[in-house]
């Protein structure tokens, strides 16, 4: 089962993901926490420490792997292990890739393939960054574009997609008993109504 969990900064998405994973985790199994953050400055070090402290108070004994760049390989290595995997977060992984000048098309393709082929329960945390203003800088605009494309591609592959706002989870997928999940759109993403109304 692939579950994509989206939300803004400090929306509660990480805590929600950890609780969801705790519900999935079989007894006597140590789930994997794949952390993509690097403590490049004091503020990021505090954020990392906050997440670590929050996890220590929970009921799970985590296996931690720090994976700032080679996330696809880390997923392949853990596929079929029987231990659920939580990736937190894809936004920082993307930021790391862009800062290191990676070929995003190939990195995104490798990650999407690893996710599609993953055997087990996989929870992916990512920021929803496309709801704000268009950034002024070229790198910032590219980041927002890449994050949007990545989130869309992952949402298409995911069994479940949840948006967390103010600590409240909103189920985006599945949305109803309609197996297409199309919200009235055709397979091409266009409205079936010739006037463009859904």
Where are these regions (language model features)?
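Portal/gating segments that form or line small-molecule/metal binding sites
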Residues: 49, 53-54, 58-79, 84-99, ...
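N-terminal polybasic/positive-inside topogenic patches
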Residues: 191-192
């Amino acid at each position: 089962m692939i579950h994509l969990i989206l939300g803004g900064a400090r929306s509660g998405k990480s805590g929600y993901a950890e609780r969801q994973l705790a519900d999935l985790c079989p007894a006597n199994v140590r789930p994997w926490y794949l952390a993509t953050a690097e403590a490049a400055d004091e503020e990021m070090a505090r954020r990392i420490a906050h997440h670590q402290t929050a996890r220590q108070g929970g009921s799970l004994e985590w296996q931690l792997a720090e994976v700032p760049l080679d996330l696809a390989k880390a997923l392949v290595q853990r596929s079929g292990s029987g231990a659920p995997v939580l990736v937190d977060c894809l936004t920082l992984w993307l930021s790391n890739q862009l800062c290191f000048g990676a070929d995003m098309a190939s990195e995104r393709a490798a990650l999407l393939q690893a996710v599609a082929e993953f055997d087990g329960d996989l929870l992916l945390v990512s920021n929803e960054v496309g709801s704000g203003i268009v950034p002024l800088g070229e790198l910032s605009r590219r980041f927002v574009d890449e994050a949007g494309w990545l989130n869309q591609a992952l949402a298409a592959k995911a069994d479940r997609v949840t948006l967390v706002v103010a600590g409240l989870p909103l189920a985006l997928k599945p949305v109803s008993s309609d197996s297409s999940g199309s919200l009235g759109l055709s397979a091409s993403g266009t409205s079936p109504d010739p006037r463009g109304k859904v």
